[in-house]
C-alpha cells in the first residue's frame, strides 16, 4: 500500500466485528509504529494491549461507570472548550455522524445508546493503550504519543484493520490500570480501539471531512 493510500484511506471506525485480531498482527503493526519520530529520540511511549477477556472486562466496567453517571477522571485532561472555528468542526462532526447513522436530533435514547457503545469501544476486540511515565513533561510526551499512535493507525489500515482514537478509553484510568496491570506512576494518554471494521454499519463507513489546504497553510 502506498503512503498516500494509507493516509487518505484511514478513517475512524465506530462499529467493529467481534472477530479477534491475531496478536502477531498487532506485533507486526507495532514493529512499524515504533519507528515514529519523537523528541530527542526519547521514545517515551509504553504500549499495553487489551484483548480477549481483558477487553470485555474493561468494556463492562467503563459502561457501568458511564451508566452510573460517574465523572471521568482522565490522567490527561480532555478539552472542554475550543476556539470558535474548532468548536464548529467538532459540532459538525457530531451532526454529520448522527445523520449518517440515522439518529434524529431529538432522539436522546439513540444518542445515549451511541455514547454507551462508545464506552464499550464500539465493539472492538482490542484496545491499544499508550502510556507515559508520570514524571514526564506532558506536552512533549503527548506530542510523541500522537506521533506513534497515528503511525500505528496507518500501519493497521495497511493490514486491513480499522482504528479509532478513543477518548472514552481513558475516562477511568484507575480501572484500566487495575485490569491491565499498569503501574500507578504511569499516565494513560490514549487508547486506540482496533479491529475489523463492520462492512455495512453506517458508523463504520462514515468519514469526516478535512479543511482545504489553503485554509490551514500559508507561505510566509
Q: What are the residue ranges of the model-derived segments?
A:
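Acidic, surface-exposed loops and disordered segments
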Residues: 1-220
Amino acid at each position: 500500500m502506498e503512503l498516500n493510500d494509507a493516509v487518505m484511506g484511514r478513517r475512524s471506525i465506530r462499529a467493529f466485528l467481534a472477530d479477534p485480531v491475531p496478536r502477531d498482527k498487532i506485533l507486526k503493526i507495532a514493529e512499524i509504529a515504533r519507528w515514529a519520530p519523537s523528541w530527542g529520540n526519547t521514545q517515551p511511549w509504553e504500549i499495553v494491549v487489551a484483548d480477549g477477556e481483558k477487553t470485555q472486562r474493561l468494556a463492562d466496567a467503563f459502561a457501568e461507570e458511564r451508566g452510573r453517571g460517574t465523572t471521568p477522571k482522565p490522567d490527561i485532561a480532555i478539552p472542554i472548550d475550543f476556539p470558535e472555528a474548532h468548536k464548529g468542526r467538532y459540532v459538525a462532526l457530531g451532526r454529520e455522524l448522527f445523520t449518517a447513522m440515522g439518529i434524529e436530533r431529538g432522539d436522546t435514547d439513540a444518542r445515549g445508546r451511541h455514547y454507551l457503545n462508545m464506552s464499550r469501544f464500539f465493539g472492538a476486540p482490542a484496545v491499544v493503550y499508550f502510556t507515559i511515565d508520570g514524571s514526564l513533561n506532558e506536552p512533549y510526551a503527548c506530542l510523541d504519543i500522537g506521533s506513534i499512535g497515528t503511525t500505528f493507525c496507518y500501519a493497521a489500515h495497511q493490514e486491513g484493520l480499522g482504528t479509532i482514537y478513543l477518548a472514552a478509553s481513558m475516562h477511568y484510568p484507575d480501572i484500566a490500570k487495575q485490569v491491565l496491570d499498569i503501574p500507578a506512576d504511569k499516565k494513560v494518554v490514549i487508547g486506540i480501539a482496533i479491529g475489523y471494521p463492520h462492512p455495512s454499519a453506517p458508523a463504520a463507513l462514515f468519514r469526516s471531512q478535512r479543511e482545504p489546504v489553503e485554509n490551514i497553510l500559508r507561505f510566509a
